[in-house]
Structures are given as C-alpha cells and as structure tokens.
Swiss-Prot record:
It comes from Adiantum capillus-veneris. The gene is rpl21. This is Large ribosomal subunit protein bL21c. Coiled coil: none annotated. The keyword RNA-binding applies. HAMAP family: Ribosomal_bL21. The lineage of its organism: Eukaryota, Viridiplantae, Streptophyta, Embryophyta, Tracheophyta. One of its GO terms (biological process) is translation. The keyword rRNA-binding applies. It is found in: Plastid, Chloroplast. One of its GO terms (cellular component) is ribosome.
C-alpha cells in the first residue's frame, strides 16, 4: 500500500500559449504542436527552446495565474524532431459528369519535450 502512495504524487504543471493553442505541460513529457514559431521550425533536433508565454503554473497546492502571462515564468524544453501528421484525403465526386477527384495534405508538426518549469528564480529568463 505504501508503494502505491509514492507513485501517485501530483506533480506541478504549467499552461502555456504556443502556436495559437493552450497546452497543459509537465516536465518529462513530450507534446506535438502544429504551428510552432517560425524561427524554431528551421532548427534541427535536440535544439533547446524556452517558452515565455506561461499562463498558469501549479506546484503542489500553490497556483499562480497570469494576466495574461506570468512575469518571471519560463518553460524550458528541447525539440525532439519534425514530422508530418497523418494524411488528410479529400474526395470530390461530380454528379452527372463521371469525374472524380481526390486531394490530400499533410501538415507538419514538431514534437518537443519539456525539461523544466521555472518561476521567480534566476533561471527564469525569457530568452
């Protein structure tokens, strides 16, 4: 019973604004984003990034909410790799013309991992 209680520790998380969407991120996990900032799209894998648009940070029972963002908060991570989404196929059938058409597109996504969340410390620089 004691081992089970140790595994169910509630860790801290942050909500960040990236690519026009809000993500709930935790250290040690990876996430996929469609619209990453353009200057980071061209960089290769294992590039370190820091995201300064932090909306909320929860650490244990303490919650800090920004308006709109927290001042001295930064989420640091690294880009794992660039990849493509599953293909979206669009088919058209024109009645009475015996013609059919299909088009497809694959959006590019970036997979990144979160290393740490900093708030009100010397490591919280938005660079």
């Amino acid at each position: 019973m004691e081992k089970w209680k140790e595994r169910v520790r509630i860790g801290g998380y942050a909500i960040i604004d990236i690519g026009g969407k809000q993500l709930r991120v935790q250290p040690g996990r990876f996430y996929d984003v469609r619209h990453f900032p353009s200057n980071l799209n061209t960089r290769g894998s294992d590039t370190k990034v820091s995201m300064g648009r932090v909306l909320l940070i929860r650490d244990g029972s303490k919650i800090d909410i920004g308006s709109p963002w927290l001042a001295n908060a930064v989420v640091k991570g690294r880009i794992l790799h660039n990849c493509f989404e599953d293909k979206l196929v669009i088919k058209k059938i024109f009645s009475k013309r015996k013609t059919r058409g299909s088009r497809g597109c694959r959006g590019s996504i970036i997979r990144f991992a979160i290393d740490s969340i900093h708030f009100n410390c010397s490591n919280a620089t938005n660079k």
